[in-house]
């Protein structure tokens, strides 16, 4: 699957939205990628995650585990793991706390794991997920995502491979361009932020 193929999947699913959006990072953007419109379709999800699995194999080789941040990363993590023939586990947080492996999940010594995200904007969730894995005995070889909307600038502290890399401008609330500021903002994402 090429980056253009992935974007066509988003368009066909009605998941490539234009307007004024407050992202889960708190930044504002004229473009929102509504990944749940992709993930609500099992066939489409399997197709895009198989594409990501191919990119992971090319970059990192064989992996035993896919680790994703809950909640948004669980579906693409699971489907990507299935395409890789790997196990899927996830990190989650107690309210207000850091991500951690729970439910008996671990990265055993000798295993190779990749962290899989859906969409990377600033890389915050990915960095937090990777931090939760640092003390595991197995090796975390890197990270992967369907779309890196930072244009390749997000620093995860680990290698990142994306099925598509886009350079979509994002703005702090106090630095909006006039055309974006003229449109009422909506918050379609999952992480609570204060509109501004």
Swiss-Prot record:
InterPro entries: OPRT, Orotate_PRibTrfase_bac, PRibTrfase_dom, PRTase-like. GO terms for biological process: 'de novo' UMP biosynthetic process; pyrimidine nucleobase biosynthetic process. SUPFAM superfamilies: PRTase-like (SSF53271). GO terms for molecular function: magnesium ion binding; orotate phosphoribosyltransferase activity. Keywords: Glycosyltransferase, Magnesium, Pyrimidine biosynthesis, Transferase. It comes from the Bacteria. Its cofactor is Mg(2+). 5-phospho-alpha-D-ribose 1-diphosphate binds at residues 117-125. It catalyses: orotidine 5'-phosphate + diphosphate = orotate + 5-phospho-alpha-D-ribose 1-diphosphate. Pfam families: Pribosyltran. Transmembrane segments: none annotated. Its EC number is 2.4.2.10. Catalyzes the transfer of a ribosyl phosphate group from 5-phosphoribose 1-diphosphate to orotate, leading to the formation of orotidine monophosphate (OMP). HAMAP family: PyrE (MF_01208). Belongs to the purine/pyrimidine phosphoribosyltransferase family. PyrE subfamily. Homodimer. This is Orotate phosphoribosyltransferase.
